[in-house]
Amino acid sequence: MKKILACALLSLGLLAPAQAQTVNAGTYDVEGTNLDGSSYSGTATISLTSETTCSIEWSTGSTTSTGICMLYDNAFAAAYVLGDAVGLIVYEVKSDGSLEGAWTISGKNGSGTEVLTPQ
């Protein structure tokens, strides 16, 4: 009886694993807050380099930074260079394809926030 119930549930898709999130290559609108709480905006371009890694470039105002990124389940992380400093941002991949995260820079106190929305 248990086998019949399990088969019935499987056929209905109730025991199927949840779909993994994905991040698409392309251009994203950027909205964020700096370490001091001030806001910034711009664009970010993600280019896939393998099934799990990518490169990312942010352009916010007169600032451009580049980094390497990776996707793991619904977490998307990027390490980047900003001037002479190294930074890290960790995003949560949302069901609508947007990315919501928090970032920091080496040697600085606090963290900023950032949302990337696909264009």
For every predicted segment, state its role:
Residues 1-4:
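Positively charged n-region of N-terminal signal peptides that target proteins for export
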Residues 7-13:
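Bacterial N-terminal signal peptides
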Residues 15-21:
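Bacterial Sec-dependent signal peptides at the C-terminal "C-region" and cleavage site
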